[in-house]
Amino acid sequence: MLQPKRRKYRKEQKGRNTGKATRGNAVSFGEFGLKAIGRGRLTARQIEAARRAMTRHIKRGGRIWIRIFPDKPISQKPAEVRMGNGKGNPEYYVAEIQPGKMLYEMDGVTEELAREAFRLAAAKLPLKTAFIVRQLGA
């Protein structure tokens, strides 16, 4: 599963996910892309589940790029622990997703195969997404 190798600090503040994606919002590597329309968080498990769904559908053909990385730790306190006594331990990592962010890209497959693979992947994600075809000159 995806997670950072090292972090300067183990825990991070919650923060707010605002605005639109200004970087990583175009198809850069492949021919087709899956773009986030909504905003939210994707856990490392969700990113991996979507990748597996796509990989299984396209079988041996094509190449997939994951354009997001879960680098924000989310901490949780154990069950039935009283409030106070500090912040909980990091349990998992998430990627903060803004509208317009390119999530996955694909190349080396037909458009209908890519469309179906992205549809299967989108079913694993808690965000609204759109299928994007690379524009000429972009």
Swiss-Prot record:
PROSITE patterns: RIBOSOMAL_L16_1. GO terms for molecular function: rRNA binding; structural constituent of ribosome; tRNA binding. CDD domains: Ribosomal_L16_L10e. Residues 1-13 have a biased composition (Basic residues). Disulfide bonds: none annotated. Residues 1-24 are annotated as: Disordered. Transmembrane segments: none annotated. GO terms for biological process: translation. GO terms for cellular component: cytosolic large ribosomal subunit. InterPro entries: Ribosomal_uL16, Ribosomal_uL16_bact-type, Ribosomal_uL16_CS, Ribosomal_uL16_dom, Ribosomal_uL16_sf. Gene3D superfamilies: Ribosomal protein L10e/L16. HAMAP family: Ribosomal_uL16. Part of the 50S ribosomal subunit. Belongs to the universal ribosomal protein uL16 family. Binds 23S rRNA and is also seen to make contacts with the A and possibly P site tRNAs. NCBIfam families: rplP_bact. This is Large ribosomal subunit protein uL16. The gene is rplP.
